[in-house]
């Protein structure tokens, strides 16, 4: 994989060089010391992946991500030394299309290979996404009971560009929205709590991490919060699970959508937002085949038109809508 580093700190650059050296297939093709330089270098030689710092002179990582995704799109991972202090910037960058976030590896310790492992795992996942090799082993659906108007669920999946898309969608929903909402966003568990807090503040709706064993209810938005998959169980409660182990991204949108298809006994809507790869497409199709309304974000409003495109290609979406039109449609369906 051809990788570029955008960072103004020599120690951080050296840490990334050493971490990448553990995987001979990775080639560093250039290094930029600020976002403006990176934007220009991408025009000259677009990499497969950029490891992007947040705080830099001239142009920061948020603006550089926005410019690169608009002009010469490629995979971007935010690499930061202090994600807690920079949480808002992290999700702004992800809103512009950054795929993931990872701490700068601390390679000066006794086990540098272990320190490099989180970064290398994320790069491996992104390599799979770029190749669109993500798949799902389909499972037979359990016939659902007749819908109850009291049991309503919106299942939403998103990846690259998702934080900003989720902010827009949730902000357009009333606090009195009468359906439970569960979000599955591709984000590491280290950043999940911060994302929930950020979404809650930005949208005006209460957003928190989903807890093992709880039942989705109207009035609170639940975000999958670990590096395990989240599933709906037969009794209507949520559970985290390591299976299936072959899913590239954890939590998997497909896994959650499939569980809704099998076990949700009321009304449900599946929504697939911006993101790279195919995760969510097969699960959305399963929801459609069980009679649920399914919505995919359109190309024009998607930061990365990968997952919704995959859904459209297999006829998984009943409706394809621009992002600003999705919340009004949810309100229309569930307030009739």
UniProtKB/Swiss-Prot annotation:
The modification 4-aspartylphosphate is found at residue 53. The active site is at 159, 186, 279. Phosphorylated by CheA. Phosphorylation of the N-terminal regulatory domain activates the methylesterase activity. Residues 147-336 form the CheB-type methylesterase domain. Keywords: Chemotaxis, Cytoplasm, Hydrolase, Phosphoprotein. The keyword tRNA-binding does not apply. The keyword Hydrolase applies. This is Protein-glutamate methylesterase/protein-glutamine glutaminase 2. It comes from Pseudomonas syringae pv. syringae (strain B728a). The lineage of its organism: Bacteria, Pseudomonadati, Pseudomonadota, Gammaproteobacteria, Pseudomonadales. The gene is cheB2.
């Amino acid at each position: 994989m051809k990788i570029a580093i955008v960072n103004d700190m020599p120690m951080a650059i050296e840490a990334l060089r050493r971490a990448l050296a553990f995987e001979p297939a990775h080639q560093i093709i250039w290094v930029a010391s600020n976002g403006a330089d990176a934007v220009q270098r991408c025009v000259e030689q677009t990499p497969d992946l950029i490891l992007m710092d947040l705080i830099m002179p001239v142009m920061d990582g948020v603006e550089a991500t926005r410019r690169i995704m608009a002009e010469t799109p490629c995979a971007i991972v935010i690499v930061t030394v202090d994600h807690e202090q920079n949480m808002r910037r992290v999700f702004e960058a992800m809103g512009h299309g950054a795929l993931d976030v990872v701490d700068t590896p601390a390679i000066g310790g006794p086990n540098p290979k272990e320190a490099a492992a989180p970064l290398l795992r994320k790069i491996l996942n992104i390599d799979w996404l770029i190749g669109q090799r993500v798949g799902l082993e389909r499972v037979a659906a359990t016939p659902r009971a007749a819908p109850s108007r009291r049991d309503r669920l919106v299942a939403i999946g998103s990846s690259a560009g998702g934080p900003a898309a989720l902010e827009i969608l949730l902000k357009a929903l009333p606090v009195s929205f009468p359906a439970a909402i569960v979000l599955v966003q591709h984000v590491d568990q280290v950043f999940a709590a911060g994302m929930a807090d950020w979404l809650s503040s930005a949208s005006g709706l209460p957003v928190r991490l989903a807890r093992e064993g709880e039942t989705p209810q109207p009035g609170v938005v639940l975000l999958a919060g670990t590096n395990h998959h989240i599933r709906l169980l037969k009794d209507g409660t949520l559970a985290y699970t390591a299976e299936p182990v072959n899913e590239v991204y954890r939590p998997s949108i497909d896994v959650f959508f499939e569980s809704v298809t099998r076990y949700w006994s009321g009304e449900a809507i599946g929504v697939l937002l911006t993101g790279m790869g195919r995760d969510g497409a097969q699960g959305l199709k399963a929801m459609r085949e069980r009679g649920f309304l399914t919505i995919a974000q359109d190309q024009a409003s998607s930061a990365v038109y990968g997952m919704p495109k995959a859904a459209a290609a297999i006829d998984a979406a009943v409706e394809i809508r621009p992002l600003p039109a999705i919340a009004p449609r949810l309100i229309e369906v569930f307030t009739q």
